């Protein structure tokens, strides 16, 4: 189930994105990117509709996925 990011309290959204970024360990190339920059990038993807927040009822987990997967 897709959860609209606008329906999530700002502090909760920030924590969700932070947890996602720390878990993913995304490779940003040879340039070091700050944690806040990574969080801002994911938030921007959510705002642009490029990424969505997904709740798995089966596993009772929340994740952020690229919208193209849905």
Swiss-Prot record:
SUPFAM superfamilies: YehU-like. It comes from the Bacteria. NCBIfam families: PRK04966.1. Belongs to the UPF0270 family. This is UPF0270 protein VIBHAR_00073. The lineage of its organism: Bacteria, Pseudomonadati, Pseudomonadota, Gammaproteobacteria, Vibrionales.
